[in-house]
């Protein structure tokens, strides 16, 4: 796509498509999220999310960056899902994975560019503070976040300590 965007400068429009929102499709909820495949075939959601994560890691991440250890990157994505709705502390994320803070920054950038996460800056009257204060981290799709933290059914979701953060993330992604 890089070559195309350079040669078509000024003559092409690029759109970022996110999973369906609640307004766009009535079946969207915290557990399923908004990916059309999961909404239409909820009985294969677990298989679909596993395949999505695998192909995302093998194809998309490798196309964007030369990540040496995809196993650690996969653990990083799972750790982020468990921190959904939290203030982003790169040091606290880097330490248990045994990677550096600059590596975490690079990996966050990859997830953000590929449309997996959003970082929501805090609101302050002072615009400068908005830019430097710690953002909150959310996954674009709550169904994917549920899958990554091991929530597979409604009962687990109802009992999960992540439920509030997942709801907050779903609102942020709308």
Predicted features and spans:
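A residue-level signal for conserved active-site and pocket-lining positions in enzyme catalytic cores
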Residues: 25, 33, 76
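Accessory nucleic acid-recognition modules appended to NTPase machines
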Residues: 43, 47-174
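Conserved AAA+ ATPase "SRH/arginine-finger" region at the nucleotide-binding site
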Residues: 13-24, 42-43
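An amphipathic alpha-helix signature
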Residues: 22-27, 50-54
């Amino acid at each position: 796509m890089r070559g195309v965007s350079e040669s078509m400068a000024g003559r092409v429009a690029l759109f970022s498509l996110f999973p369906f929102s609640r307004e766009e499709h009535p079946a969207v909820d915290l557990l399923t999220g908004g990916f059309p495949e999961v909404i239409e075939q909820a009985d294969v959601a677990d298989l679909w999310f596993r395949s999505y994560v695998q192909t995302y890691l093998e194809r998309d991440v490798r196309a964007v960056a030369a990540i040496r250890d995809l196993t650690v990157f996969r653990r990083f994505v799972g750790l982020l899902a468990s921190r959904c709705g939290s203030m982003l502390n790169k040091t606290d994320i880097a330490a248990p994975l045994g990677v550096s803070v600059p590596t975490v920054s690079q990996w966050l950038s990859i997830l953000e560019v590929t449309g997996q996460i959003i970082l929501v800056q805090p609101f302050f009257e002072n615009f400068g503070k908005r830019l430097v204060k710690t953002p909150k981290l959310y996954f674009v799709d709550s169904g994917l976040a549920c899958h990554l933290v091991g929530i597979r059914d409604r009962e687990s979701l109802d009992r999960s300590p992540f439920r509030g953060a997942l709801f907050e993330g779903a609102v942020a992604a709308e």
